[in-house]
Amino acid sequence: IVENVFNQLNEVKDKRVENFKKSADQIEEVLGRIVNRADKATANGVDTSSITASANNAKAAIAEARSLITAEAGKIYSVSITAEANLKSDLAKTRETLNGDLLKIQQSLKSARDMVHNTAVTLAKISNINQYEVASSTTSESANQ
C-alpha cells in the first residue's frame, strides 16, 4: 500500500511537471511575439529600451522557472518508514514536501508570467505599435519574369 502511495505521488509530480513545462513554453512563446513587435518598432526608430529591459527580466524569470522544473523532474519522492506508528506522519511529510516543491515552481511561473504581462503593457503604451512593419528583402514575382 505504501509503495502505491509513493507511485501515485510520483505520478502526480510527473503530470504537474509536464504541465509546468507547457506553461513555460507558452509564456516564452508570448514573450517571443512581444519581442518581435518591439523589434519592428525599433527598426522604425522607436525607443524600446524599457521593453528590452523588461523582456530581459522576463527571460531570466523564465530561465529560473525552467531550472526549477528540471530539478523537480529529476526528483523521486520516497520515505524510509521508521515504525508503523509513524507511517501516517512520514507519508504526510513526503506529501507536504512535494506540495512545497510544486508550489515554488508555480510561484516562479506566475512571476515570469507577470513579468511578460508587464512587458506587454509597456509595449502597448507605444502609440500606433501595430502600424510598424519591417521591410522585407524578397524580390517580387514580376522581377523574376
Feature-to-residue mapping (PLM):
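C-terminal amphipathic alpha-helix
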Residues: 1-27, 68-72, 76-145
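Amphipathic, heptad-repeat alpha-helical segments
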Residues: 17-62
